Amino acid sequence: MRIRRILYFYGNLPNTYTANVLRRLAFSCWHTHQLPPTISATRSCFSAMAEMQDSHNEMELYSPNPEVRGMTCLNRDAFDKTIHVPVIKIKKEIINRLMKSLKHRLIQRPSLKRVIEDPKDDVNKLVLLDPYKVKSIDSFDESDHVLFKQFDVNPQVSQYELQLTYENFKCEEILRAVLPKGQDVTSGFSRVGHIAHMNLRDHQLPYKNVIGQVILDKNPGITSVVNKTNTIDSTYRNFQMEVLAGEENMITKVKENYVTYEFDFSKVYWNPRLGTEHNRIIGFLKARDVLFDVFAGVGPFAVPAAKKNCTVYANDLNPESYKWLLHNCKLNKVEKRVQAFNTDGRDFIKTTIKKELLKYADMPSAEEKPSLHIAMNLPALAVEFLDAFKNLLEEEPCNSFILPTIHCYSFSKDDDPLQDVKARAESFLGTTLEDCSMHLVRNVAPNKEMVCISFKLPSSVLFQRLSDTGEPESKRPRTAEAFPLPHVQQSRNS
């Protein structure tokens, strides 16, 4: 259970290099059952002192006032708080030369100036120091004292009364102070262009408007915060969402793997955490290869494949996804290499894919044939569509035929998700998959994995002949009339 929680945390990190390294480490530990290593202020008064007295720990010092607990309508003024921090006086003409050397001892707070005017001194300025790194003159090391002596600085540590405001608190500090004690605090979200997409839990819903406004305030570039509701569109599998804060404009622009996409986030599916997986599949393709994308969405497989000079046949049942797929092909200047379709995935397999497979089968054997790939990225249902490939080319010869490689995605809540997905794929195909590749994509929830299974479509499935009863000839039941039972002598012990 602890490992699954770690996977859930690392699997939901944004797509950065560091996050991807952490994900790979977590997934590796999952397989070996090992845990990874623990990984506008205003001044009010100024007074001299010899040493700073020990106070609360850092979390308490930088926690907003307890009165904000349970707030359901954001009141920024309620976060004003006075704290005491150490300061030293430094002459104005040398302060810039000293700041770099003192950087590691300065106070670190959002929107807080660390050098301020001293109203009683025209010659010096006050430098705000970190109260947990500087307690007294003894907190400075030898190199600091050499520097002070060089610039004729008297490093007298004094106490300064600093008023923190809402702007000086971090997002997680505010939310931790507002939400009830002992409950999970979320400040994480998926960023989709200017939209912050959150998945709030039930106990957080009474505070959703405060959470949304804080996320909006603390993240430059975010102009809209939305929350996924529990309602799912049964036809297109889209989650409904509500706007918690900011504008209601859901048409956004994102960049993924050097490709630009535009779409209406409220009407299509887009997951910014899948960029690495999209790139992994595109890595299997080379120029002149062919990609069939059964559940194409707005084009995260189709567009980069076309940019790689592949021929692409992309389909999606959702009319909005189809519209934005066409738009993104034009936006990235690959519309001539992509044929888009707006139909059911099963129909796409039985018509378009079948037709194109036959076309490539008729290519002269002397001509270099491309590799064929079929992407099926609808994890909730894609495995169930695999039976559409059974006897797809029932009446066609299979000699010298190019067998396509299928990349099929699925969710699993099983203790062994890789084996579970493989077994279900084999069940819908009606055959065993001796040579397949299993890839753990990401942890969707503490007990839910997203898996990709890749395999060459077996010729026994693609060219399976059916009898008049609609069953494979090799699996027709042997009736007593056709095969009389031999006489078996009864054993004495029976």
Curated annotation (Swiss-Prot):
Might you report a single GO cellular component term?
A: nucleus
Q: SUPFAM superfamilies, per this entry?
A: S-adenosyl-L-methionine-dependent methyltransferases
Q: Among the record's GO biological process terms, what is one?
A: tRNA methylation
Cross-referenced InterPro entries: MeTrfase_TRM5/TYW2 (IPR030382), SAM-dependent_MTases_sf (IPR029063), TRM5-TYW2-like_MTfase (IPR056743), TRM5/TYW2-like_N (IPR056744), tRNA_Gua_MeTrfase_euk (IPR025792)
Point out the transit peptide region. Answer: 1-32
Per UniProt, subcellular location reads as:
Mitochondrion matrix; Nucleus; Cytoplasm
Single GO term (MF):
tRNA (guanine(37)-N1)-methyltransferase activity
Establish whether keyword tRNA processing is in the entry.
yes
The EC number on file is: 2.1.1.228
> Disordered: where is this region?
468-494
Q: What is its main location?
A: mitochondrion
List UniProt keywords, sorted A-Z.
Cytoplasm, Methyltransferase, Mitochondrion, Nucleus, S-adenosyl-L-methionine, Transferase, Transit peptide, tRNA processing
Enzyme superclass (EC): transferase
The record lists S-adenosyl-L-methionine as bound by H278, D316, L317, D344, G345, N377
> Which reaction(s) does the protein catalyse, per the Swiss-Prot or TrEMBL entry?
guanosine(37) in tRNA + S-adenosyl-L-methionine = N(1)-methylguanosine(37) in tRNA + S-adenosyl-L-homocysteine + H(+)
User: Is Methyltransferase tagged as a keyword?
Assistant: yes
According to its UniProt entry, what is the function of this protein?
A: Involved in mitochondrial tRNA methylation. Specifically methylates the N1 position of guanosine-37 in various tRNAs. Methylation is not dependent on the nature of the nucleoside 5' of the target nucleoside. This is the first step in the biosynthesis of wybutosine (yW), a modified base adjacent to the anticodon of tRNAs and required for accurate decoding.
The record describes its quaternary structure and partners as: Monomer.
Family, according to the entry, reads as follows:
Belongs to the class I-like SAM-binding methyltransferase superfamily. TRM5/TYW2 family.
Under which name does UniProt file this protein?
Answer: tRNA (guanine(37)-N(1))-methyltransferase
